[in-house]
From Swiss-Prot:
The chain crosses the membrane at residues 12-31. It catalyses: [GlcNAc-(1->4)-Mur2Ac(oyl-L-Ala-gamma-D-Glu-L-Lys-D-Ala-D-Ala)](n)-di-trans,octa-cis-undecaprenyl diphosphate + beta-D-GlcNAc-(1->4)-Mur2Ac(oyl-L-Ala-gamma-D-Glu-L-Lys-D-Ala-D-Ala)-di-trans,octa-cis-undecaprenyl diphosphate = [GlcNAc-(1->4)-Mur2Ac(oyl-L-Ala-gamma-D-Glu-L-Lys-D-Ala-D-Ala)](n+1)-di-trans,octa-cis-undecaprenyl diphosphate + di-trans,octa-cis-undecaprenyl diphosphate + H(+). Pathway: Cell wall biogenesis; peptidoglycan biosynthesis. It is an enzyme of class 2 (transferase). InterPro entries: Glyco_trans_51, Lysozyme-like_dom_sf, PBP_transglycosylase, Pep_trsgly. The gene is mtgA. SUPFAM superfamilies: Lysozyme-like (SSF53955). This is Biosynthetic peptidoglycan transglycosylase. Its EC number is 2.4.99.28. GO terms for biological process: cell wall organization; peptidoglycan biosynthetic process; regulation of cell shape. Peptidoglycan polymerase that catalyzes glycan chain elongation from lipid-linked precursors. It is found in: Cell inner membrane. GO terms for molecular function: pentosyltransferase activity; peptidoglycan glycosyltransferase activity. Keywords: Cell inner membrane, Cell membrane, Cell shape, Cell wall biogenesis/degradation, Glycosyltransferase, Membrane, Peptidoglycan synthesis, Transferase, Transmembrane, Transmembrane helix.
Length: 242
């Protein structure tokens, strides 16, 4: 009886893992129609007098400005081109900081944030963290770095009901994402720790200071030349359509 139940559970786990892997593989080419975070925000608003209206419009990689790509990397994950989904040094530093009694500090890479935003609910439980690690590994396995950043920039929250670079650019600055300048891009990146608390379009002193620091980091990282490190490097025999 117990052995049969164990076998069934293992079989179920296998099929769930296979289904999740196929889903992540498909999203290498297909734009995600929505995210788990968008659904969560929509559900949160059901009890309010005015339900939340979600705004999001997909922009492909070549229509997203280099300023914004670099601003987000500088602000959120400066080792993005180097790691395989997890920044061990940042994790160790965050653990030491949290154990010292300071305010909770995260150490999520862009890859982890994509996994969390696309597939998972909010929270810090161990089951959710385990699923985040699983989806992060799949994303790093199946997607090139450019695709990870493309999905991130089209899915990240930038205000109440505002998701993705295009909606954020229009909402905060009245322009399309391709027309964001360097300062505007840095202000968008500056509010990412808490985009529902801070405004990129109406920055306070903290956001302005952080945006200035982000612009310095963009320069130190090499500017748009850094993005060359994100290009996939395949052997000559690799099919170009993959």
């Amino acid at each position: 009886m117990l052995r049969s139940l164990t076998r069934r559970l293992l079989k179920l786990l296998f099929w769930l893992m296979l289904a999740s892997a196929l889903l992540v593989l498909a999203l290498r080419w297909l734009p995600p129609p929505g995210t788990a975070l968008m659904l969560e925000r929509k559900i949160e608003s059901w009890g309010s007098e005015q339900p939340l209206q979600l705004k999001r419009q997909w922009r492909p990689w070549n229509e997203l400005p280099d300023h914004l790509k670099m601003a987000v990397i500088a602000a959120e994950d400066q080792k993005f081109a180097e790691h395989w989904g997890f920044d061990v040094g940042a994790i160790q530093a965050a653990l030491a900081h949290n154990q010292s009694g300071g305010s909770l500090r995260g150490a999520s890479t862009l890859s982890q944030q994509v996994a969390k935003n696309l597939f998972l609910w909010s929270g810090r439980s161990w089951p959710r963290k385990a699923l985040e690690a699983w989806f992060t590994a799949l994303i790093e396995l199946f997607w090139p770095k450019e695709r990870i950043l493309e999905v991130y920039l089209n899915s990240v929250e930038w205000g109440d009901g505002i998701f993705g670079a295009e909606a954020a650019a229009q909402h905060h600055f009245g322009v399309g994402a391709p027309y964001l300048n360097r300062q505007q891009a840095s202000q968008l990146a500056a509010v990412l720790p808490n985009p529902r608390r801070w405004s990129a379009g109406r920055p306070d002193a903290y956001v302005n200071r952080r945006a200035a620091w982000i612009r310095q980091q963009m320069t130190q990282l090499g500017g748009s030349h850094y993005l060359n490190q994100l290009k996939p490097r395949y052997p000559e025999w690799w099919p170009r359509w993959l």
